[in-house]
Amino acid sequence: ALSSAASDVYKRQLIGCTPAQKQVMQNDAEVQHPYIIDMSELEISETPQMLSDFADSISYIRLSEEPLLPEIALTFHLYVDKNENIYIKEGSLVYKYNPKGEFIKSLFNVGQGPKEVILPFGDPVYNSEQQFMLVNNYGVNFKQYSLEGTYMGDFRTIDSLDNHKRFIASIEDKDVFYYEYHYPKRGEEINLDGPYLWYVRSRSNDSIIYKMPNHLFHIKATKGMYLAFGGEYPLYYNKIDSNLYMRHVYQDTIFRTTDALKWEPWYVIKHHQRDTDYANLMAITVGDMAKRDVEGVYQVFEVSPLPTGVLFAYNDLNGWRKDCKTGFCKIGEKALTCSPNSFKNDLDDCLKSIRLPLCCHFQRNGYLYVLISTPDFFEEGAKPPFPDLTEDSNPVLVKLKLKKRWKETN
């Protein structure tokens, strides 16, 4: 349940929002945002939801066998550009494939040279409007490459006050970043997120042109012996066509922007009473309390927008990410169930299920692309989509055609 401080803020967020549920199938310009992701009655069920709840059809793209990609891991990163070329980060490299899945090239080399990357930190940042990619070069600087692999220069990640910037998105001529935290002293009263959740800089003059306020900055905890947070901290983000969605991992509002200057609250999570809140999560993060002190308490993890609703991951605070329950909540309806079992594939007989939104995926132009390990096609009840596919083959790219909004189909 929510603590009193966070609850007051949360209630203020919801005031005036619920009418959106009565208008959800109208044109976006006519709908009162944000949409409510209502999980207040969410139950955990062994019965999985269906891919057909949000997708109309499924197809498959065979990737070249060279270079060899190891068995799919959660560390993979997937991107598809406006020409449907495919980019897969595996280990220290980013591989480019054409729309048919044929390998083209690696976009940069690993090494000590001025145009090379020593060791990439995190995932690459793609700019779909200006067709380039940013790579965090060992935390020293960000290197920029065109999507053809041409080196375009670099810029430092540390400002004049020794603050480290971590860039996570790029839209038009602007970059979105957050400042990495300064390690607090034991006993210090702190909100590790700071007064702003993220910042936007202009690429033309390297100036900060927007700051997203942290409206829960007044909630603080006492630094204990350690810091503890998951690899997703502090932000979830999705770039879908011209829209960028951002949410702090401990907060309830998902913001949407098309220009990185105007951020609209697009979705708000309405929690179940068993869910934890920002105050408890911040206390756990800075070591003011331990996860074992909040057994049986749950958290909403990833939320991935789709045209007709959202995919979400949900789990006990003491559980592992890979063990998250997953579900789909249709716009205007309540999320009633989530399941530890993957979404059942009722669109064809090649694949039994898909572990969305936890598996590696990317959305563009009404399609959801998902990387799937080949052993999944050899489970009982499944069959490979290609006759020469083996369990040792490179992963297959699944292409789900997503259902459209009502206003787009009438």
Describe each PLM feature range:
Residues A1-Q13:
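Single conserved hydrophobic/aromatic residue that forms the stacking wall/gate
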Residues C17-N410:
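Eukaryotic scaffold repeat domains enriched in small/polar residues
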